[in-house]
Amino acid sequence: EFRRVLFRSTVMFFLAVASIAANAKESKKEGDNYHAKQILIVGLHDNVKSNYFYNGMIAEETGMKADSIDQTYNTIIAENIAASVKNGDCKFIPANATQVTGQVLNEIKVNGESEDCYSDLSAVPTEELQKVLDNADADYLLVLNQHYLKWQDQPLRTLFHIVSYTLFDKDKNEVYRGNNFFTCMNLENPDKLRKSSRKSSSKIASTIIKTLDED
């Protein structure tokens, strides 16, 4: 009987601790000083690359305009990332066409090849980056470095869509870099691409959220 009482007391204690911790977290979220971490997403120009397809082929197969393929891919992935996070400590903001100035966008360099790409902000003026982030009420910049369309014939005909990305803080420090991919049988039109890339985009968001939670 004593052991049973002790067990119940122990369980009640841990439940109480868990409840207090949960309430404390909620109180923090509701407090005047609470601010969800906001991440501005920007896709680079001419960042759709492939080991097989060229822009004319992509345009013909997908119905996209050849001169806006990069914009279409960037928009779809950015919007999927943002839509995958309904609430919580992070919010993703897809940048619009005028939100990121040329002094920032045009100075971002991409290093690496194929699926292993990462961005370099060393040439970006720090004050310009901070101005862009402040205007968007954002704390971090997520750069979609490249969409690499990797085609393979063997063992199965498969198209890998590999999205590489880099996360920076306001001081141009790299916080995280990585990539994620999804597969399909052929090039897809924008509507199908949006659907096919949802799970992969959600994984990018969850990886970034986990990284920022560890800071």
What is the meaning of each model-derived region?
Residues 1-6:
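Short, small-residue-biased leader/transition segments that mark boundaries at the very start
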Residues 54-141, 177:
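N-terminal segment of the mature soluble domain
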Residues 17, 142-143:
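Conserved short hydrophobic patches within well-ordered secondary structure
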Residues 44, 96-98, 145-147:
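Short, well-ordered beta-to-alpha junction loops that form the rim of enzyme active sites
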Residues 13-22:
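Hydrophobic h-region of N-terminal signal peptides that target proteins for export
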Residues 8-12:
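Sec-dependent signal peptide hydrophobic core
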Residues 25-53, 132-137, 148-215:
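C-terminal/domain-edge helix-coil "capping" segments
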